[in-house]
C-alpha cells in the first residue's frame, strides 16, 4: 500500500495552485512593470463574413493552455523563465468597428510606449488594424509579415471598408507598396490576386516556402507579425470561421513562426481567427495554444 503524501506537501501544492491565475495564459504570471511582453485579447467578430464565434478565442486559449506544459522541447525554453503579463480581454463595443479599433490602438500604443511588446489574441482579423495603426505611428518604417489563407485585400466587402476581408488593404493604406509580405494565401477574388501580383504587396501564395528567404532583408527593420490561423489546413485546424482546404500542416507553421519571432525585430504581433464554437473537439484551440506558446518563447531575446 503506497504511503500518502504528508499533509504539508499537499498543502504546499494546493497553495501554489491558488496563487496561479487560471485567467492568464499558462506561465504568463509576471506583473506589468517587469514584463517584456504584454498579452491581451480582442474579443471582436462583428464583421465576420461566414461563421461567427472568434470573440470567444481569448478565454478558450487561456483555459485550454493549462493542458500544455510551460516548457517547449522544440526550443528548450520555458515560459516560467519569461516575463509576460496577461492583461486579459479588452472590453470592446461589439457593434462599432471604429470604436473597437480605437480601443485596440490605444492599448497597443500604451504598451509600445512602455517599451514592451504587444501580443494580441483575436478575434477576427480586423483587430490587427488597430494594433498596426499604433505600431506604424511609432515605427514609420514598419513592415508586416502576414500568414493567412485569404488575401484580405478587398477595397471593401459589401460596401464595408472596415471588414476582416479588407484588413490588409487597410494596412496597405497606411504603409503603401512593398512593406507587406504575404504567405500561404490560397483564396480571394481574382482582382485581389491581380492587385497583389502587380507589386502592391510582396506576394507568396499557397505555401510558406519562401518565408525564410525574406528574413535576411528584414533584419534590423521593425516588423509587425500577424498570423491568421486559417493558414493551417482544416484537417489540422477546423475551428475557424472561413476554413480553406490546401493549407499548411502544424509543424510547418510552428517552425516558420518561431523562426520569424527569433530572427527579426518583432515589435508587435497577433494570432487570430480561432473560432472555438466551430470545433467542439477542442483540437483547434489546442493547436492555437501551442502556436502561441512557441511564439512567446521565440520572442524572448
Predicted region positions:
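Conserved alpha-helical scaffold segments that buttress catalytic/binding sites
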Residues: 16-301
Amino acid at each position: 500500500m503506497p504511503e500518502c503524501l504528508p499533509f504539508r506537501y499537499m498543502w504546499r501544492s494546493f497553495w501554489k495552485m491558488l496563487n496561479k491565475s487560471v485567467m492568464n495564459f499558462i506561465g504568463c504570471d509576471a506583473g506589468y512593470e517587469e514584463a517584456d511582453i504584454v498579452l491581451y485579447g480582442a474579443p471582436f467578430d462583428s464583421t465576420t463574413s461566414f461563421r461567427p464565434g472568434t470573440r470567444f478565442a481569448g478565454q478558450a486559449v487561456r483555459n485550454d493552455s493549462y493542458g500544455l506544459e510551460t516548457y517547449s522541447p522544440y526550443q528548450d525554453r520555458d515560459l516560467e523563465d519569461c516575463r509576460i503579463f496577461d492583461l486579459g480581454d479588452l472590453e470592446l463595443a461589439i457593434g462599432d468597428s471604429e470604436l473597437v479599433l480605437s480601443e485596440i490602438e490605444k492599448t497597443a500604443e500604451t504598451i509600445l510606449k512602455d517599451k514592451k511588446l504587444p501580443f494580441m489574441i483575436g478575434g477576427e482579423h480586423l483587430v490587427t488594424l488597430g494594433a498596426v495603426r499604433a505600431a506604424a505611428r511609432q515605427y514609420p518604417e514598419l513592415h508586416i509579415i502576414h500568414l493567412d489563407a485569404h488575401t484580405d485585400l478587398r477595397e471593401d466587402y459589401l460596401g464595408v471598408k472596415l471588414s476582416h476581408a479588407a484588413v490588409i488593404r487597410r494596412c496597405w493604406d497606411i504603409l503603401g507598396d512593398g512593406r507587406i509580405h504575404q504567405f500561404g494565401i490560397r483564396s480571394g477574388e481574382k482582382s485581389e490576386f491581380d492587385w497583389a501580383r502587380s507589386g502592391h504587396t510582396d506576394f507568396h501564395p499557397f505555401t510558406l516556402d519562401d518565408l525564410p528567404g525574406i528574413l535576411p532583408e528584414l533584419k534590423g527593420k521593425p516588423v509587425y507579425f500577424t498570423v491568421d490561423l486559417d493558414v493551417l489546413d482544416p484537417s489540422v485546424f477546423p475551428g475557424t470561421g472561413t476554413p480553406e482546404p490546401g493549407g499548411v500542416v502544424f509543424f510547418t507553421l510552428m517552425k516558420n513562426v518561431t523562426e520569424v519571432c527569433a530572427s527579426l525585430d518583432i515589435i508587435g504581433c497577433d494570432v487570430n481567427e480561432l473560432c472555438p464554437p466551430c470545433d467542439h473537439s477542442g483540437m483547434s484551440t489546442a493547436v492555437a495554444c501551442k502556436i502561441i506558446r512557441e511564439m512567446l518563447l521565440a520572442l524572448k531575446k
